[in-house]
Amino acid sequence: QDVRAFLLAKKEEGLKATTLNLYNSAIRFFYRNVLHILWDDITVPRMILEHKLPTVLTASEIDRLLDAVDDIKYKAMFAVMYSSGMRVSEVIHLHYDDISRSNMQIHVRDTKNRMDRYTILSKRCLDILTQYWFEKGRPRGILFPNKFTGNYLTVSTLEQVMRRAVADAELPKTATPHCLRHSFATHLMEQGIERQNIQALLGHRDPKSTEVYLHVSNKSLIGIQ
């Protein structure tokens, strides 16, 4: 009962279900393996996780977002995210040599699962990147360096820029830099691109990670009907 009360108190503090389940697992391990006390999963159940569909912007909303970004560096970064489906951290760690103009591809090296991959470089994105490159001193190492330190930008910096652009463009407040990756995948799904190809472009090891975009795509089609 004390553990149940503790977890309920943490829930009232605003902790998410995933965090509460981590608390639950740690306490359960301590009870079973250290104190050798039976654990009652009925009295202290695990929290049910909410599986919310990701926020997806329409093509016109993407245009409004990019138009709302004044700094060409951040406009280029957001364009890369939508054009390629790259994760925020992957775009931050891009280097000049990762951009292949001849093949219209981007070499993604610093990945979440440590597996290199190639993804799409659209003509529109290349045009924005080219404008950025000439206007910002033609960087040859880190493609999007911090202008003060020359090092990598932080995720929080991009999130701040995104929040301002979202407000200026009057887009859904739930839109984050990562939703550009969601939008990329969903739009490909709606265009009929095979799921395996989308999985490869996104760098998903598990096909189930890609299936969420099928659900979002179906939801969009229902809205059209």
In which residue ranges do the predicted regions lie?
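Conserved catalytic core of the tyrosine transesterase superfamily
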Residues: 1-225
